[in-house]
């Protein structure tokens, strides 16, 4: 099994985490909701698999390139 890292594209605040470790996600499923410059930005999975790590908490300020979620996929 391979791991896919979901990383932040910009500086933002983590508004909502919509998945938990162990959740099975499909490509296109929402993982997180971020806020940047008063805009809400959904973070969608690019792969199908199982969430194995959530590296952020709600309310955290993240930087571009920060690890958000790790997904194990076939």
PLM regions with names:
Residues 20-31, 58-68:
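Short, well-structured beta-strand-loop connectors
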